[in-house]
């Protein structure tokens, strides 16, 4: 599957899980029919957070190759951070910063918000990505061990977004299982597994992408705007 398909499916899965959790948390909504309840259950900010986290999780496994979209995006983020630090140092050493103003004020504030758990989680996540890169494409980073390790790291680093990120990660593994190229899902076992049903960047890839985007649109209309969507007659409802 292409990177954009992994992002769309990861976002759709994370938003669907968020809607289900919000529905179960509301007794009145949980006891009503899926076809009749149209009240909004997610704020726009929550929807965007879930979608972004799911999309990011959907790209994480492909950080094991330098040509992947995820790896390129991470490289840009690291480059931006290095550029920011370099600019701060340049301003400090050149004396351009006004007297009494700390050129590292933004970085110091960010560091003050980070506790030991956040740092430990971030370091664990970096280690998972490093092992994945060392093991090659569709190796460690495409395994159940990596999924569990990533979730554990995210629980420390970003507890509020750990579940949608992990769901996006899991959706990536599920999609890649449908591909014709094996992945080492049961790492450290060397044998790869695949179902061989789909081809990356083929017609099926475009179909999956379209369905994921449609699911996101429907989730936004129903979960955020509270629009009751037409329900085909004869289909079962959740009650």
Regions found by a protein language model. Give the residues of each.
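N-terminal membrane-targeting hydrophobic helices
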Residues: 1-239
